[in-house]
Amino acid sequence: MSVTTTNNLIIPEVVSSLIDGSLGDGVTLLPLAEQDDTLVGQPGDTLKFPVFSYIGKAAVVAENGQIIPGQLTASMKSVTVHKYAKAISISDEARLSGYGDPVGEGSRQLAHALDHAVDDDLFQCLNDVGVARKYVSGAISADTIADALTLFGEDPEGQKVFLTDAAGLAALRKDPDFVGRGDMGEELVMHGAKGEVWGCEIVITNKVRDNARTREKNYFIVKPGALRLVNKQGALVEIQREPEYMRDNIFASLHCVPYLYDESKVVAITQFTGLAVLTGDAERLGFKTVAGESGKTRVIVPESWAAPAGYRWVYALNTAAAEEGAYGTAYAGGTNHAGNDAQVAASGKTHCHLLLVDGDNTPVKTLTVAVHAGA
C-alpha cells in the first residue's frame, strides 16, 4: 500500500520560512526606512500621527517686556495598511519531475514579488516630495550634488545615500571627486554602494527614471529615517490543494504600508520632463484659496511646495475651468505669487490657476482651484 509522506506534500510552514527568509532582500530602500510595529497585534489598520510646525525663532525681549506666547500647531497625518499579495500554481508533474526546485524557486519569487511592490511604494513616497526639496539641474555631477546638499541647510552632515540610474553613475565615475568603493569606509548604510561623492553613498537603481505622473526624473539624496514602514502582519502563506487538477496553489501576502516620515531628510535632484497637472491632488497637497476682505481672496501655496531656485509660482483668476499652460511655451498673463497673506481682487472670478514657471515663464506644474472671496 502506498503511504503519503511529507516528501509528497508542500508544507506551508516550510514555504513560509523560505519566503520570510528572503523577504526584504529585494527592497532597495529598506535600510533607509525605520520599521514601525505600532499596529502589530493591535486592532485597526490606520495609524495617525501629528506633524508639528516650527514655532519660529526666539525674539529679543527687553527688561520687563512681555513675552508673547507662540502657538504650537500640528496637523494629523494618517496612513492605512496595504495588503500586498501574489500567488503561484505548481502542478504535481512540475513538483515531482526532479528538475530544479519549483517549490523553493516559487517561494523566492513570491518574496521578490512582495518586495518589488513595497519597494515601488517606497520610491513613490520619495517621488511625492514637495518642490521645496528639489534642486533643479539638467545633468548629474559632483558639483550638482554639492549644490543640492545646500537644501539640507545647517544639517548636511551624517550618513546619506544618493540614488541614481546607470547613466548617472557613469557620469560620476568620470568626476575627479568620485571616491571608489575600495576607498570608502566600512560603516555603510547600503551594502551595494558603488562609490561616494561628498559624503553620499552612491547606489544604482532602475527606479530612477522618467515619471509619467509627475513629469519628472528625480535622483534622490536620502538620510536614514526619512521613510517609515508600518507593519501589520508579516508574510502569510496559505496552500490550496486542487485535487481535480492535481496541483497546489501557493498564496502569499504581506500587510504593511510605507510613508514619507521626515521630508527634511530628502533632497531630489530634479529634471522636469513635461507639464504635470496637479488639480486632482490640489486639496491633498494644500493648494487652495481662502476668503479675504470683501471681494478679495488669498492664494495659498503650501510651504512644502515653495518654488525651488530659478522658479516661481504665478497665478491667474478667471471664470474658465480648463487647465492653463503648455510645456515648452512661455505662459503669458500670470501674476507673481506674492505670498500666502497677500490679498487678491477676486470679484466675479470662479477659478484660480496656479503655475510653477522657470525664468523663461515656461510652466512645469499647473493646477486649478476654486476661488473663495470675502463677502
Which functions belong to the PLM regions below?
Residues 346-367:
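Beta-strand-rich modules
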Residues 43, 48, 143, 149-236:
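Extended oligomerization regions of viral-like shell subunits
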Residues 336-350:
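Surface-exposed, short loops/turns at beta-strand junctions within beta-sandwich domains
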Residues 311-315:
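Short beta-strand elements bearing conserved aromatic residues within extracellular beta-rich modules
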Residues 300-310:
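Acidic, Ser/Thr
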Residues 1-74:
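N-terminal "assembly arms/tails" that initiate or stabilize quaternary assembly
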Residues 90-157, 267-276:
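Alpha-helical scaffold segments that mediate packing/assembly in large oligomeric complexes
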Residues 1-32, 214-216, 220-225, 229-276:
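Protruding loop/beta-arch "assembly-hinge" segments enriched in small, turn-prone residues
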